[in-house]
């Protein structure tokens, strides 16, 4: 069993029931929701690893636009989960748009259970890798800002900082600090 929490969002109760039965055999926890608006509290908690998101919800238009809008909304949050889009009306353009908007994968109803599980696992790994890369980039920017700030210090400021660092290391012991600074 994989230690992941999966959310299934679909307006068809039969689809929710079948997916829950299928996925609870493989994943630690499954949450089913009948509309994406019910997913909002889970975004702030950040505990969902992946979402299977239907493309159409109670809309007369079955073009997937509603699903794409919800995809954008979910992916716009920090630490957004991996998303696998699902629709009965799949086409290449819809799949490409989903991937361009941040979905990790796309699957068409009726689905193959093994294929869906593989896609979810791959999506979780891909999303985790993307999150790690994002964190590393943020850390690099922070380090660069710190280095630039240090480079802008005057010589006197650098000396003062060095003396303060030594004093901190010596826990305020002036004799020890003077010795380390080679002051007689």
Task: Give the label of every model feature segment.
Residues 110-120:
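C-terminal output helix
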Residues 148-184:
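Bacterial C-terminal helix-turn-helix
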């Amino acid at each position: 069993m994989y230690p992941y929490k999966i959310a299934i969002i679909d307006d068809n109760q039969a689809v929710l029931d079948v997916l829950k039965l299928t996925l609870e055999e493989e994943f630690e926890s499954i949450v089913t929701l009948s509309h994406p608006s019910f997913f909002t509290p889970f975004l702030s908690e950040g505990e969902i690893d992946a979402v299977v998101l239907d493309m159409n919800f109670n809309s007369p238009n079955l073009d997937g636009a509603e699903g794409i809008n919800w995809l954008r909304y979910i992916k716009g949050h920090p630490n957004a989960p991996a998303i696998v889009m699902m629709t009965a009306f799949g086409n290449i353009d819809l799949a490409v748009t989903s991937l361009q908007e941040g979905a990790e994968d796309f699957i068409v109803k009726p689905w193959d259970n093994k294929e869906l599980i593989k896609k979810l696992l791959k999506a979780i790994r891909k999303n985790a890798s993307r999150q790690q890369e994002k964190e590393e980039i943020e850390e690099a920017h922070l380090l660069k800002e710190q280095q630039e700030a240090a480079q802008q210090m005057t010589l006197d400021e650098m000396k003062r900082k060095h003396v303060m660092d030594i004093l901190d290391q010596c826990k305020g012991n002036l004799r020890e600090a003077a010795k380390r600074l080679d002051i007689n």
